[in-house]
Amino acid sequence: MQLELSKEMNLPMIVHSRDAFSDTLDCIKNVGWNRGIIHCYSYGIEEARAFLDLGWYIAFGGGTTYTKKSKMEQMLELLKFVPKDRLLCETDAPYLAPVPHRGESNTPVLISHVYDFISSARGISVEELNETVDKNIKTLFAI
């Protein structure tokens, strides 16, 4: 229903999908609306590929900064895999505060930690990442 409304109104949809990849992908495909954000992304590269192939953006927040050591290599690969023109950063405030504030209430001011982590993983400057995300938001929301 919400995907259909988003499509009718020609607005991007923001989807939080946790442990429901197949169901989420099926809903998106069934409605045929390919303008949105997979918020608080928590899947792997293959799942990202499926969303990206449909035209969706992938958004990373504070949880990205405290990936388990055993999964850090996979996270770094994922952060490099997402194309520049589909990458977004977010706070998810008041939840999922980034390291070094994990366990505290999250606020937008802490987004710098997310930008530091992602720019380091991608081998780019924070300024370049900021420009990328700014451009992507403007494109997605047609502003």
Predicted features by range, described:
Residues 5, 110-143:
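Mid-to-C-terminal alpha-helical segments outside catalytic/metal-binding sites
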Residues 1-88:
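Catalytic pocket-lining loop regions of alpha/beta-barrel enzymes
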Residues 85-107:
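Short acidic/histidine-rich active-site segments
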Residues 40, 100-107, 122, 126:
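Alpha-helix initiation/capping motif
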Residues 12, 63, 99-102, 117:
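Conserved short-loop catalytic and cofactor-binding motifs
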Residues 58, 95, 139:
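Active-site micro-motifs of SAM-dependent methyltransferase domains
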